[in-house]
């Protein structure tokens, strides 16, 4: 496996909510948008017991996928790792470390002012 580079970032999401991830890729040397035309892509989510590959799209310099609500349910953290392939070799790895904030329970007490 030939890896040109690994990019890593951290995000926080709320438990049991669907999140759409869009990553715009730029050249580290020039800062210009990097064109991934002709590359293939694969994203693996790991949130406790929820571990699976998700549909990922790559258009020019934009990588997009969805973290489904059930992935973060009951999890404290997770990892989303996207591998970008060129000619069958791993060219780039985009790793997102995801902290999961527990969902707040709704107020079920009746409003005393009603």
Residue ranges and their predicted role:
Residues 1-108:
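N-terminal assembly/attachment segments of tailed bacteriophage virion structural proteins
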């Amino acid at each position: 496996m030939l890896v040109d580079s690994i990019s890593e970032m951290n995000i926080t999401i709320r438990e049991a909510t669907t999140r759409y991830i869009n990553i715009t890729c730029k050249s580290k040397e020039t800062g210009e948008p990097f064109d991934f035309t002709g590359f293939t892509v694969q994203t693996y989510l790991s949130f406790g017991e929820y571990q699976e590959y998700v549909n990922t799209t790559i258009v020019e310099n934009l990588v997009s996928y969805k973290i489904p609500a059930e992935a973060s349910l009951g999890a404290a953290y997770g990892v989303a790792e996207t591998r970008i392939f060129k000619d069958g070799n791993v060219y780039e790895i985009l790793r997102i470390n995801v902290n999961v904030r527990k969902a707040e329970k709704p107020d079920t007490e009746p409003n005393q002012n009603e």
